[in-house]
Structures are given as structure tokens and as C-alpha cells.
Amino acid sequence: MSIPKIIHYCWFGGGTISPENRKCMESWEKYCPDYKIIEWNEQNFDISKNRYVQQAYEAKKYAFVSDYARLAVVYEHGGIYLDTDVELVRPLDELLELPGFMGFQTNNEVATGLGFGARKGNSVVQALLRDYDALDFLKADGSADLTPCPERNTRVLQALGVRKDGTRQSIAEMEIFPAEYFCPMDLYNRKLRVTPKTYSIHRYAESWKPKPGAVSRILQRLLKKHYYTWYCPLRGRIERRLRKRT
């Protein structure tokens, strides 16, 4: 059984897809012309099926809704998921005979937003889904859990045997590829290194994030992933306390 020729993408919240992302999506039709493309949104995906997802949706943190939804639709239907800012540079057909595939980012975390695929009912995708079962998006203090899905998913994959070293490896029903296959653009400095092995480029449009000012851009470069997992939550707590005093 092959991975079906379906490309899934998520677009929750009803916003407009940017021209830059539309251009990326045009590459899907160019290199996968016989694939069915399905958009998943609040009209055809059950937000209430998972507490974490429902809380994230109500908080209008739609990227975190997609973190779960992409796993669910690939598990239930099979196929390939792509973020809207993923540009294909060659066909994906030769990946269809694998039971499943994912890729490392340049920081050696596995990221489903780069693009991943699997047959319906894939056991590794199921394990990633189950990790969300006991999670709340909202913490006890009312703040949001902004743990990025690559960090969360990679912990689960490590428990299944993945080595966080960026090398090609196989676990159960999943092939994990080095960054050059699906992530030739560096996560932090945005340098692009396309090779003959590259299938796609994740453009890191990050339309769900507020546009940073000069100070924030400097902090992002210095703190890297800790900017969103440590600095932003801390800043949010301080801002809430200040608002309560006014």
C-alpha cells in the first residue's frame, strides 16, 4: 500500500492566505499535478475532538490548532501534509512507497510543518497524536503553552528511538530525513542551501506571529528557540500583572 496522492494543508481562523504563500502552493500543482489538495479548517475539522485544540482555537492561536489537526488528518486519511509556506522544488512521487516520512530542521528537531507523509493509520503518527490527549493549551495561571510542535513532537520521537542528530534514520513506520531534504533554509539565519536531494523549501513565513520590532529581532537571534518558549511567555506574564495594576 502506497501513501495516497493527497496533499493536506490547514487554514484556520478565516484569514487571507498571503501572495507569498499562494506562490508556494502553486508549486504543489506544478510538481504534483495529479494530487488531490484538501484545505482543512473549522468547517470540515472537528475542533472539539481534543481539549488542547479547542482551547488553542478559542485563544485564536491557530498555528497550534494546525499542529494537532495535521497529524489527525494524515492519520485518518493518509497522504502528505504541507504548511502553506512550503515550496516544492521537485516531485514527491518517489516518497510514496515509504510507510511514512518526516524531516529534521537545521536544529536537529523533527518538524511536521516542513511536510510529512504517511499511510492511513501510521503508528508513529498515532503516537504523536496521543501525546496531545492529556495536554491543555492553557496553563493553570491562564497563560498559553507555546511549546513549539517540533520540540514537543521530537520528544515523542526520541522515546520511539529517534536520535536527535540530524541523520537519516528509520523507526517503526517512519523514515526521518536530514534537513537538506525538506529544510535547506537555516532556521535562524535563513541561509538557503539547496542540494540535489532537496524536495522542498520551508520559507518560514510565520504569518501567525506578530511582526517583531528591532529589539525583538535582536532577541530572536540571541535566544533562538528560547525566544518563544521562554521570553514571550515571561513577557506575557509581566504585561498581565501590569495591566491588573492599572
Feature annotation, model-predicted:
Residues 1-66, 84-246:
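Glycosyltransferase-associated regions of secretory-pathway enzymes
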Residues 68-79:
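Small-residue hinge/turn detector
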